[in-house]
């Protein structure tokens, strides 16, 4: 899992919706998610595969089913990276304001 993988996975609106559904439910199967979405189970499974590759969900076998649960760590890392980037821009903007005034 890397930040580019996380941002790439989150770049698709359907994948974001799948992740939101998994997070809201605690865990879910592709079949359960597809029943609540306007896409097929196969499409949901493909999106879950991408999310799992980015570390955003964790698959767990439960008998014949695979249940997916969200994993918050990659989102936290992405948020921290964006916060650091925002702080750098704030510092540069403050420096620019000081030099202009």
Predicted feature descriptions by range:
Residues 2-40, 62-77:
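N-terminal helix-turn-helix DNA-binding core of bacterial DNA-binding proteins
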Residues 35, 46, 52-53:
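Alpha-helical residues within the helix-turn-helix
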């Amino acid at each position: 899992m890397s930040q580019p993988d996380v941002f790439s996975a989150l770049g698709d609106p359907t994948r974001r919706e799948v992740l939101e559904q998994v997070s809201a439910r605690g865990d879910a199967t592709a079949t359960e998610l597809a029943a609540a979405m306007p896409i097929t189970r196969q499409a949901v499974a493909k999106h879950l595969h991408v999310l799992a590759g980015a570390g955003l969900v964790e698959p767990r076998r439960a008998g014949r089913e695979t249940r997916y649960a969200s994993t918050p760590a990659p989102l936290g890392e992405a948020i921290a990276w964006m916060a650091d980037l925002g702080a750098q821009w704030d510092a540069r903007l403050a420096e620019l304001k000081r030099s202009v005034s």
